[in-house]
Amino acid sequence: MYQLARSLLFKLDPEVSHELSLDLLAASSRLGLNRFLGGLPSTKPVDVMGLRFPNAVGLAAGLDKNADAFEALGALGFGFVEVGTVTPKGQAGNPKPRLFRLPEHEAIINRMGFNNKGVDHLVSRIKSHRYPGVLGVNIGKNLTTSVEDAAADYLACLESVIPYADYITANISSPNTPGLRSLQFGESLAQLIAPLVAARDRYEAAYGKRVPLAVKIAPDMTDDEIKMVADTLVDQGVDGIIATNTTLSREAVLGHQFEKEAGGLSGMPVRDASTHVVKVLAEHLKDTLPIIGVGGISSGADAVEKLQAGARLVQIYSGFIYHGPELIKEAVASTDAYYRELDLGI
């Protein structure tokens, strides 16, 4: 069924088909049809960051930027859904065209530029729904905000969403906002994260609820850089690391007509790089921080590979575009079987 729908959607401009799909999913929620979307399978829950996830497979940020369809997306079987990236003020993002499919590689290039309707709109969307699942909110900075002042944007977003999110992700690794990736390193990273951790702790002290803070990092780093980032995040007291965002590398798609398009490359070409980052993190952190693995998952085996490398949870996005809900089912079944075998010592 999805393959037929995909063949029709892929005849449209990528961004048009994206918006159409979200509109249809949002309509499913409005009409009370989500119960027909499949629902959560019976699986062993996974406890990470102090939260209980129904299963280990989540939807990565970027698909539902404005929390338009998170209820329906959750009803497809995801163990958790991450909305955003959201910024303090709404912004249009980069000029179009800015989204490109590479079907031969099951890949996508995007240079969207954090297009979203702003944090107040996103909060209003979340407040107007009763979502029973685990909901993450991915936060970023506005294009007009300097890198030096970025912490204020992240803090404004965190303080707005923390009453409504199950966890929050600071996106410091999108390649489509100039200078953003420089925040991953050294004192810049510490200065960005420290006020977010302090705000998380203030909220917990005031309301008795800890909302975990994760940080999403890029795949385009050396092993030493990955370790330095990890050390800083541990020192600052974050709750998790999401590895990874899209890559700037085009090595895997050389010769493709979109090879020279600017933006981040996601999908199968980033799989090995993201898995490598997960492995380096896991070996270095030694269970100090949980890792959520994302990048190039297009099968159940790919999802398990991330867990074997050291991730506790996984997220999918591009693979979902190419394979639809069947990938969710396959990844959930495979990761659940993996965890059950670990429990049995098989």
Swiss-Prot record:
Keywords: Cell membrane, Flavoprotein, FMN, Membrane, Oxidoreductase, Pyrimidine biosynthesis. GO terms for cellular component: cytoplasm; plasma membrane. It comes from the Bacteria. Gene3D superfamilies: Aldolase class I. GO terms for molecular function: dihydroorotate dehydrogenase (quinone) activity. It is found in: Cell membrane. Substrate binds at K65, N110, R111, M112, G113, F114, N171, N176, N245, T246. One of its GO terms (biological process) is 'de novo' pyrimidine nucleobase biosynthetic process. Its cofactor is FMN. PROSITE patterns: DHODEHASE_1, DHODEHASE_2. FMN binds at A61, G62, L63, D64, K65, T85, N138, N171, K216, T244, G267, G296, Y317, S318. It is a peripheral membrane protein. It catalyses: (S)-dihydroorotate + a quinone = orotate + a quinol. It is an enzyme of class 1 (oxidoreductase). Its EC number is 1.3.5.2. Binds 1 FMN per subunit. The active site is at S174. Pathway: Pyrimidine metabolism; UMP biosynthesis via de novo pathway; orotate from (S)-dihydroorotate (quinone route): step 1/1. The keyword Manganese does not apply. Monomer. Belongs to the dihydroorotate dehydrogenase family. Type 2 subfamily. Catalyzes the conversion of dihydroorotate to orotate with quinone as electron acceptor. This is Dihydroorotate dehydrogenase (quinone). The lineage of its organism: Bacteria, Pseudomonadati, Pseudomonadota, Gammaproteobacteria, Oceanospirillales. The gene is pyrD.
